[in-house]
Amino acid sequence: MKTEKSTYILGIESSCDDTSAAVFCNDVVLSNIVATQQVHKEYGGVVPELASRAHQQHIVPVVDQALKKANISKKDLSAIAFTRGPGLMGSLLVGSSFAKSLSLALGIPLIEVNHMQAHLLVHFIKEKNKKVPDFPFLGVTISGGHTQIVNVKDYFEMDVIGETLDDAIGEAFDKCGKMLNLPYPAGPEIDKLSKLGNPQKFEFAKPKVKGLNFSFSGLKTSVLYFLQKQTKEHQNFIEEH
């Protein structure tokens, strides 16, 4: 139910291959609509140009659905928040252009959001029986493009104390999954198969990294060379293992 004190914010996310829109009333999520792009499956990874085109097709219906599910109209909005980055340039441009145009047309404030900060602060969204963390707390962001350990001191004060020095873990999962002929995205499939396998069966080199940093490129290369060697000796090695 709408009240005079209610603040409605439309959030728009388009940093990679999902077009998302959500409506918040104060700090409660009223709707969250996501359009996933299936076009990338045949390529085994996100193709930036195709992602941008798909965002252009999805952005209007996704926002319309988010508003409809929240049972409000554009005129009820108090502000619009959008992902400023990091992400794919073409994808970000679609979301930012739409958000800026809509805020200008409605005459309401525009809020730029760093989506890595948003990952860390998502715990503050109100949910039933859910406890929010106290500051400071340690956060870990693991996505297709980032792997970080962050000391979160306050809403806008954060220090990265560890990060990947090369590939993000999500990228390593997808690349290894492609080598294994797994469907994209490979992460869920690798996670499922790992529970059925023998962790002692094969051994791969472990990265030597100082401090709290990570490195996944060596693992990716190790898997590549291992599979090349095994499939050369046994053509059906992947299918049999």
Positions of predicted regions on the chain:
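Short Gly/Thr/Asp-enriched flexible loops that form oxyanion-binding sites at enzyme active sites
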Residues: 82-106, 125-126
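Short, acidic/small-residue loops that bind anionic groups at enzyme active sites
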Residues: 100-120, 164-168
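Conserved phosphate-binding catalytic cores of ATP/NTP-utilizing and phosphoryl-transfer enzymes
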Residues: 1-5, 113-137
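A short glycine/serine-rich beta->alpha loop
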Residues: 44-51, 82-89, 160-164, 207-212
